């Protein structure tokens, strides 16, 4: 069937892509995207779970908080206690600490109120530091996904 309309998807994508890269560096756009994703997660995942009977019980709520704190403390303690014996691989014990910290942060900070630029900067720095430690066991700015330069660029852009 001839409609007279050409399929020019590649042309449209080529026109949008250069501007999209610049837009994605804007911290306001990043925060808006984070809030959209968190809103979807809250509406489709968190709220249905929160309304279940088991999650509403006080025992379950206390257990989740205690579990997050235990993971955080145990991961940090094992990292420092066993660093001499494990050497470079001691950073693997940070994984439970990071999971516990992320669990506590997401339940207390991000799921109840919208994300602000300050919270987003804090989250990006936490992720950058975590990636830097997990890639080679040292804090040496060797991360590639969550770089501190990208968060510094957005900090200077919002301050000027």
UniProtKB/Swiss-Prot annotation:
Q: Does the keyword Transferase apply?
A: no
The record's Gene Ontology cellular component field reads: outer membrane
Membrane topology of this protein: Multi-pass membrane protein
Q: Which domain of life is it from?
A: Bacteria
Q: Name one Pfam family in it.
A: CRPA
Going by the UniProt record, its keywords in alphabetical order are: Membrane, Transmembrane, Transmembrane helix
List locations, semicolon-separated: Membrane
Where would you find the membrane-spanning parts of this chain?
Answer: 62-82, 91-111
Q: What is this protein called?
A: Sulfur-rich protein
């Amino acid at each position: 069937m001839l409609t007279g309309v050409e399929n020019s998807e590649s042309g449209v994508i080529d026109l949008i892509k250069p501007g999209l890269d610049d837009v994605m560096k804007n911290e306001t756009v990043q925060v808006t995207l984070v809030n959209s994703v968190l809103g979807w997660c809250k509406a489709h995942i968190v709220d249905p779970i929160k309304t279940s009977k088991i999650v509403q019980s006080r025992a379950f709520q206390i257990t989740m908080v205690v579990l997050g704190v235990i993971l955080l403390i145990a991961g940090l303690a094992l990292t420092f206690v066993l660093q001499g014996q494990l050497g470079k691989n001691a950073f693997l014990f940070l994984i439970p600490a990071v999971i516990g910290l992320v669990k506590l942060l997401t339940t207390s900070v991000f799921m109840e109120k919208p994300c602000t630029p300050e919270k987003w900067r804090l989250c990006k720095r936490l992720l950058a530091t975590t990636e830097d430690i997990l890639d080679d066991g040292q804090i040496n700015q060797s991360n590639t996904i969550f770089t501190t330069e990208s968060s510094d660029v957005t900090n200077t852009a919002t301050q000027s």
